[in-house]
């Protein structure tokens, strides 16, 4: 018995820090699972546990780290993001493609958003370059000041207040190692615009086919600056 305990301790010490920080596998509620069930594909060939990004706006570049764990449902991941100033925890469908349940907090505020509706008109996950598609989502949002409660969620009869539709296109498919030397397989470059946000001119991201994980890397807005990110760690 003592040998087994020592072996477990040694094994834990040999793991990277993100792997040691692994609580019980999150259990999804049935409502979230049903929202994406029509768009599910087979489980990914490969897994990723940690991604570090560097960039943002040229005026104030920063680094942010994502710690990723599987859940009890394929292609839905538990993601903890830390940028050094704040932390958010979310459940993401296909990585950062769609936040299903997200909590963000700082010293003063707690922000919570839960996915209430989701649809896409094409199974873009397996579609070739050149494919155009749309998807939409609706969410319920709660913002509370620490020590107070201020529910800003729209009433159930008026969910369209938090409804948005996106128009997207798969522009090309590239070797994933172009983004980082550790990434295997191919990556689809996807560009989207949000029809309900006039300031949001476009988002470019990459879907890592072997990992079933989407990462947004460039945001273009009507403001002077452009947010651009690069992958500095992938393990």
Q: Would you name each region that the model predicts?
A:
Residues 17-19:
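Boundary at the C-terminal end of the N-terminal hydrophobic targeting segment
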Residues 21-109, 142-235:
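Acidic, serine/threonine-rich low-complexity disordered tracts
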Residues 115-162:
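Mid-length scaffold segments of soluble, non-membrane domains
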